[in-house]
Regions:
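N-terminal low-complexity, intrinsically disordered segments
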Residues: 68-78
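A positional/architectural concept
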Residues: 48-52
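Exposed, interaction-prone extracellular/peripheral surfaces
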Residues: 2-44, 60-65, 74, 83-119, ...
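Acidic, metal-associated active-site segment
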Residues: 57
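Active-site SXXK
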Residues: 124
Length: 313
């Protein structure tokens, strides 16, 4: 996988100009419902469920109708079961949920996770625009969660990039504790569930720290009616501890001291991350969520292009 040598001028921050410049490269990133395929080993691949479905009308329930489409409001008023009918929307909504929590402003190699996430989100924003899809999503940090309703056109992509580069969490000066990270991610998933309509494509870009059982529950429900692609970002030091010694790491503007003299401590460190990643990928596979694994030293543009390959029906 290519080292970080893309357009970023800083490994710790992004500019709107840099993200706008990705429009041309994004033209070759495939987002068609039937062709997104993760090439990461062991990943689950499922065909996308298609474009968004827009409510058309309700009619009396008939044998064979999907019980999940029962119109409970009309049913309650008429005292007779009614089912919702949908028509296919011309444009499929694409929602990108980008993680800018304090834990994302970290790297020992390459660029911050937040930089890799922003470049990935920007490329997908432009790819959605080039396909004629409507673009919206969630951009969230430790305490600021912004909802962006889907719209069409170049302005929709520019709006997303503007909110991405102007998000207040780029100025964070501390790292939240585990419980706050968990709450921030949960609130973002809850917000996502409120704005997403059935038949959408959802892209989640995160390191998934604090991915609680409640967050899993909400995301599993979203996966029933939508197609989800998760982009999991980690730093190489999370996979394998450095050689024996004492090291000072910088997360946001905080210093973290780690001691790796003990072999047992090094093994426990590596095994802890492997277990977390294994549980995460197992969850993705169980619910048909496609995924890509990126690191802070990769080129996110090339990773997206190489990981998303055409799949004929």
């Amino acid at each position: 996988m290519s080292q970080v040598n893309f357009l970023t001028s800083s490994p710790v921050h992004v500019t709107q100009r840099e993200l706008i410049a990705l429009s041309g490269k994004a033209k070759i990133i495939p987002l068609e419902p039937n062709i997104i395929k993760s090439l990461q080993a062991g990943s689950y691949v499922s065909q996308f469920k298609g474009r968004g479905m827009e409510f058309d009308e309700s009619r009396p329930y008939q044998p064979g109708d999907d019980p999940r489409n029962i119109d409970w409001r009309v049913t309650a008023r008429s005292n007779q079961a009614y089912t919702k009918l949908f028509r296919e929307e011309r444009e499929r909504p694409v929602y990108i949920m980008t993680d800018l929590r304090s834990n994302m402003h970290f790297a020992t190699q390459g660029s911050f996770k937040s930089v890799i996430a922003s470049y990935s989100a920007a490329c997908i924003s432009w790819a959605a625009h080039h396909r004629g899809d409507r673009l919206g999503g969630i951009i969230y940090g430790d305490s600021n969660c912004q909802e962006i309703k889907p719209k069409l056109g170049r302005q929709a992509a520019l709006r997303y990039l503007h909110k991405l580069t102007d998000h207040p969490d780029w100025k964070t000066s501390f790292t939240e504790n585990d419980s706050n990270q968990e709450i921030a991610l949960l609130n973002a998933v809850i917000s996502l569930r409120k704005i997403v309509r059935p038949g959408s494509l959802i892209i989640i870009v995160s390191d998934f720290l604090g991915f609680s059982q409640k967050s899993r529950s909400y995301l599993s429900r979203l996966s029933q009616y939508n197609d989800i692609l998760a982009i999991f970002i980690n730093d190489p030091i999370e996979e394998k501890s450095p050689p024996p010694g004492k090291y000072r790491l910088i997360a946001s503007k905080n210093d973290i001291l780690i001691d790796t003299h003990s072999k047992q401590a090094r093994n426990d460190y590596s095994n802890s991350f492997k277990l977390r990643r294994s549980i995460l990928f197992e969850f993705f596979s169980r619910y048909g969520i496609n995924y890509i694994n990126m690191t802070t030293k990769c080129n996110p543009i090339e990773s997206l292009i190489s990981s998303l390959k055409r799949k004929n029906k």
